[in-house]
Amino acid sequence: MINNRSVIIGIVVGENSGDILGVGLIRSLKKCFKKVQFFGIGGFRMRSENMECWYDISELSIMGITGVIFRLPKLLNMRRELIKRFLKLKLNIFIGIDFPDFNISLEKRLKKYGITTIHYVSPSIWAWRSNRVFALKEATHNVLLLFPFEKSIYARCGIPNQFIGHPLADEIPLYPNKIALRQKFDIPSNRCCLAILPGSRPKEIQILTKIFMHCAKLLQDTIPNLEILIPLHDTDLINQFVTLTSFISVKFRVLHTLTAWEVMAAADAALLTSGTATLECMLAKCPMVVAYRMNPVIFMLIRHLIKVKWISLPNLLAGKPIVQEFIQKKCDPQRLASSLFYLLNYNQEQRTTLQQEFYHLHRSIKLHANDQATRLILKYINLL
């Protein structure tokens, strides 16, 4: 039912993954109102839905402690400006999507001014910096959770929450059509194909591209006609990737696409960095190797704070190691190539067993996330 009330909603996202979540939520909310306006910070997807963005996510997207320190004065100024503008608009509700170090502090201040705040995507308090849960309790009226293992943490701390599943699980089919996707990307049905995703941030691309592509070279030397596909959506990242690989004699195709999961579903295996890409790969039912490397000094400083055995979402969701992970020194071309060679030569029984694991995990988070989030937001602005 469409409501005639005029509603003003503030949203802030800090990364591409938040832009994806944000645009789905905006589309769902638009169905409920005759007049609804969105203001804040978003990416091109959210702008395409007529959200008024005062800053672009590129101005927030940073990586590492040094990046935060260098950008701190600008970030603080942005936060002050956002608070001033949101108060002037008299928001009905504010939704901070992920990006916790910025959004939680913003939510805390808005809440003190009487604005209802929702935090969408739990910080990885189950992995490290668990004290952030207390900041969330002070800053927000409710937390929207994407994964089932998060709910018990919030229940123990007495923080209002709702497990809504993940929008990507609603978007990606339970049984991706590999044949059709191979036709879409012009991949012969009998061609062995590897998807490589070296990251979504410039720093990740800088660190991981050479390692990943030297791995690809080792595999192409071993597997005749192995096709390497690189799905990237950002022109700057594509240019950076091509520059970094210019001296490595490996054949590959860069696919300028917003739906990397389709490329992974078409591939026989994938090599990717940790993060949302591991979830997409699982939902695409594609065998994967997960790798990550960061500044060794930073890693030494934070290693004792990390509380989980695994970094990839498939392993965290399964509660056991169903995909291989290679971190820091173990993230080298030889180890990655050896593991991928094994995956690329999976027999049908091995492939089916892994895909069934992925299928059951997919079902566990396929819960109509945008609809659930919308209903909760309507309750908080007294429309349900």
UniProtKB/Swiss-Prot annotation:
Enumerate the GO terms in the molecular function aspect: lipid-A-disaccharide synthase activity; phospholipid binding
Its top-level enzyme class, in one word, is transferase
The protein's name: Lipid-A-disaccharide synthase
The protein's role, per its UniProt record: Condensation of UDP-2,3-diacylglucosamine and 2,3-diacylglucosamine-1-phosphate to form lipid A disaccharide, a precursor of lipid A, a phosphorylated glycolipid that anchors the lipopolysaccharide to the outer membrane of the cell.
Keyword terms: Glycosyltransferase, Lipid A biosynthesis, Lipid biosynthesis, Lipid metabolism, Transferase
Q: Does the keyword Repressor apply?
A: no
- GO BP field: lipid A biosynthetic process
* Disulfide pattern: none
Which superkingdom heads the taxonomic lineage of this protein's source?
A: Bacteria
Taxonomy of origin reads: Bacteria, Pseudomonadati, Pseudomonadota, Gammaproteobacteria, Enterobacterales
Catalytic activity of the protein? 2-N,3-O-bis[(3R)-3-hydroxytetradecanoyl]-alpha-D-glucosaminyl 1-phosphate + UDP-2-N,3-O-bis[(3R)-3-hydroxytetradecanoyl]-alpha-D-glucosamine = lipid A disaccharide (E. coli) + UDP + H(+); a lipid X + a UDP-2-N,3-O-bis[(3R)-3-hydroxyacyl]-alpha-D-glucosamine = a lipid A disaccharide + UDP + H(+)
InterPro entries for this protein: Glyco_trans_19 (IPR003835)
**Pathway(s) the chain acts in:** Glycolipid biosynthesis; lipid IV(A) biosynthesis; lipid IV(A) from (3R)-3-hydroxytetradecanoyl-[acyl-carrier-protein] and UDP-N-acetyl-alpha-D-glucosamine: step 5/6
Q: Please give an example of a GO cellular component term from this record.
A: membrane
